[in-house]
Amino acid sequence: MKRMLINATQKEELRVALVDGQRLFDLDIESPGHEQKKANIYKGKITRVEPSLEAAFVDYGAERHGFLPLKEIAREYFPDDYVFQGRPNIRDILVEGQEVIVQVNKEERGNKGAALTTFVSLAGSYLVLMPNNPRAGGISRRIEGDERTELKEALSSLDVPDGVGLIVRTAGVGKSPEELQWDLKVLLHHWEAIKQASQSRPAPFLIHQESDVIVRAIRDYLRRDIGEILIDSPKIFEKAKEHIKLVRPDFINRVKLYQGEVPLFSHYQIESQIESAFQREVRLPSGGSIVIDVTEALTAIDINSARSTRGGDIEETALNTNLEAADEIARQLRLRDLGGLVVIDFIDMTPIRHQREVENRIRDAVRPDRARIQISRISRFGLLEMSRQRLSPSLGESSHHICPRCQGTGKVRDNESLSLSILRLLEEEALKENTKQVHTIVPVQIASYLLNEKRKAISNIEKRHNVDIIVAPNEAMETPHFSVFRLRDGEEVNELSYNLAKIHCAQDENTEESLLSRNVETTAVIEQPAVESAVVALSISEAAPTPVERKSNEPSLLAKIIAKIKGLFATKSEENKPKNNRTSRNPNRNQRRSQDRRSSRRPRSENNETERTEEQVRNVRERNQRRPRRNLVEESIAESAVNSTPVFEAKEERTEPVTQRRQRRDLRKRVRVEDNETVVENNFSTTEKMPEVDVITVQNNDEKPVHQNQRSERQERQRRTPRHLRAANNQRRRRDQEPKSPMPLFAAVVSPELASGKAWIDYSTVNLPKENHFLSVDELLEQEKTKKGFITPAMGIVVEEKSPDVKPALDFITQPANESVQKKVQESLDRLSSYKPQEVVESIDPAINVDEPETLEKVSKFVRTYEFNGRLGTISSVPHTKAEMTLAKANDEMPEDFPIRAWQDSRYYFYGKGAAGHHCAISHVYSEPTRTKSE
């Protein structure tokens, strides 16, 4: 049987334990000095708005300011006329000095302040009230099946005010609508008291404090499976009995006072189990152990097999140890109330089925936990990651403090290493200008090491830097701590060395930080909430309605058997009736839960959103109707032009062709009609007057097949124009479409059109005649025969006024300025032709006529005297120049004689291992660095 044990014999600590038999499975400890602030309601003041973080910092009365993100700001704090698109700007919503009602969402942890929210939630016995969050609400995720449907019906019958959200807790299962309505009435009355108290005085102050551990334990842990509540303090027993009588009268008979001689927790043998929650290492029944280390980022858990010998082989031993560790880890997480990221290093298991078995075991073990837990699979490194919701400060945070000696690291530096570090720090302080004395306050062990083993080093520092170093031991100081003070000229202290520790300690106590911390300690007064609790605020004469015992409608055993037999012969229609079980629920519940459904998430107001959606729908409908209407009008006009008979009857019989959603764009159209509405109006006007119809529409209809024929002839694939060309209203350039310059240029001159790319030159390839420089032997012999046979007389040749092979570029404008260039080129060609043999003299002059005899000259007969005696082959007609090979001049340098010397032994000798190096040398030679000289 499960029991709730409440130990309140010591006023400094109140403990609540939940046991199943003699096994502890949940624990809650609260001290008067460590009350949790979570769920407390404060009236705070905005001190700073940070747009980069999308958050504001709130002074709510604590030492550190709270953190209020933008998503946690309720809609009621937005200005009335504030309209935004996308994400709102936090500077437009909150201003510095504004007062807000906030609730602590997460406790302070380390250097982080508390996380706050303006969406207040008040927890009752059966319900959770969210007064300013109407979108939130529902039923607890732990409630399933028929119980869930019953609670939905009960919720629908409740009288809930507008703008209020409700969540039904697991304790509300099986409660009547009257009991739920009573709990709602208590919570609403409590919220009214909170609003009245917030207007009583200015911020910051505490409005509502979360209930103490007794009320909280009764509210959170009191379930139907708890059979007994034992309390060992008469005062706490009376308080708990009154509270249970008011909120849960059906549990009044289960509250009992423990009066045994043996302490309550020792009677059920759970003291040793509670002590295991404070230890770093926890033993397993098989002999293994788990080691739990809490860090700033995560909680690391390591599993060691140690002396575990369960199993026949190593794989079975690892599996059994991991299964035991999975149960114990889930239990320790509840006892220690560890939250955040948890990483478990299981013993390596090779079979995949063993890994899945361990994963399933840990999922089953964490199922009774109140916190939300997410578990991943075991990775290839043997690690399992899981996250646990942080409900309250962990057991270590609430009952432990950081060690003043090691600062929470658990390790202390070695004496010798610490002494050498202090020695280096002393020399750094002595190096500073205007230093007269350096004082160091160290523990006794460090002072002994510095004044004996390192005496020479301290004296050398004093001589080099001309300072005085004083080492003063302090008995109250422990190893890792020390202090170094630097005194300038005129600040010398003429005190005895053993009094320096007291003097410097007194100076440290008078610093600003120490005075501030002492003021905080003296002024720290426990705040009293303006509203004590819902029970105190309400003067309700009547308690919660007692649950009416319902007559069990369960049939007898015989009736069940008969019903089962009938069920076998029932029709299929009865089987297909929907059942209210978990499978009928929305499978996307987790996704819906992850979304924040608060009003701050809606970026636009409802009015603007509805207006915009209506406009969008109207525009889409009009756009879809324009094209079919225009096509119908054009077709009707064309038919009316061909046939004089009315077209309306045929129009009804003819099926309209379905227009494509996206037609191909015809790139050959040069004129586009953008105003569709005007076209439709004109077409409608033409349909009214049938005799005035023109044939223009028929021509438009004939255009389409012409383009289609052209496409079929060319057989080219049209691709969609890229987006960057469509934006610039350009077209894709084809291969056959050569770019033509809109502004022809006669030469590649520098012009703004050419530089900007508006004009370009046609660089089409010109096929020049190839000159054959190499002749075969036959061709060469034929040329020689023709030369021997006859001598051609010199004749005048009439040349037309055309440039022989040079043609102007297309779209070029020839100018007279180019004629002089051509004449100069022609003169240079004539000059080169004069070097040929004087057989034929050709005078190429376009101005000479044929009839003039002055151009004729007589040439003497050419007699060949050359005889060929070599080999026949391909002979090049291109002249070649040859030159003899030359040698590069070299300087006359005589090589020097290489000196030959006898080998000489070294003066240094090696004396064996450990005798080498600078510190073991007999003599040393030093030389100053030299600089290379440049000639």
Swiss-Prot record:
Record's protein name: Ribonuclease E
Keyword line: Cell inner membrane, Cell membrane, Cytoplasm, Endonuclease, Hydrolase, Magnesium, Membrane, Metal-binding, Nuclease, RNA-binding, rRNA processing, rRNA-binding, tRNA processing, Zinc
Any GO CC annotation of this UniProt entry: cytoplasm
SUPFAM superfamilies: Nucleic acid-binding proteins
UniProt-annotated location(s): Cytoplasm; Cell inner membrane
Superkingdom as given in the UniProt entry: Bacteria
Coiled-coil residue spans: none
Positions contributing to Mg(2+) binding: D302, D345
Annotated NCBIfam families: PRK10811.1 (NF008074), RNaseEG (TIGR00757)
UniProt similarity note: Belongs to the RNase E/G family. RNase E subfamily.
Residue ranges, compositional bias (Basic and acidic residues): 593-625, 701-719
Any GO molecular function: zinc ion binding
S1 motif domain sequence ranges: 39-119
SMART domains: S1 (SM00316)
Biased composition (Basic residues): 720-734
Residues annotated to bind Zn(2+): C403, C406
Enzyme Commission number: 3.1.26.12
Transmembrane regions: none
Start and end residues of each stretch annotated as Disordered: 571-669, 698-743
